[in-house]
Amino acid sequence: MLSIAICDDEEYFRTTEKKLISKYMAGKNCECMIDMYESGKELLALRSAISQYNIIFLDVNMEEIDGIETAKEIRKITKDVF
């Protein structure tokens, strides 16, 4: 089972991405678990638990800490997430 995180500050996009990913994965007969986060700060608060995810989708334009900076911080924690 794939573990996926979606990090976007806009609820509409988080929900839409989750639906699209779920539909795609179901079409490939692949089980997945999808968690959603409202900010890079919320996601980064997981610290080492971030490594539970196989894939993380990040919004580039977010308040406080953007997707690029969030990705840099994730890489400091783990290099095993795409």
Which sequence ranges carry the predicted segments?
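Conserved acidic carboxylate
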Residues: 8
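Conserved phosphotransfer cores of two-component systems
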Residues: 48-51, 73-80
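Receiver (REC) domain active-site loop signature in two-component systems and cognate sites
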Residues: 60-62
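Two-component/phosphorelay signaling modules centered on CheY-like receiver
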Residues: 11-35
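Non-catalytic signal-transmission and effector/linker regions of two-component phosphorelay proteins
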Residues: 1-3
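Acidic catalytic/metal-coordinating carboxylates
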Residues: 39, 66-69
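Acidic, metal-coordinating helix/loop segments flanking the phosphotransfer/catalytic sites
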Residues: 18, 36-55
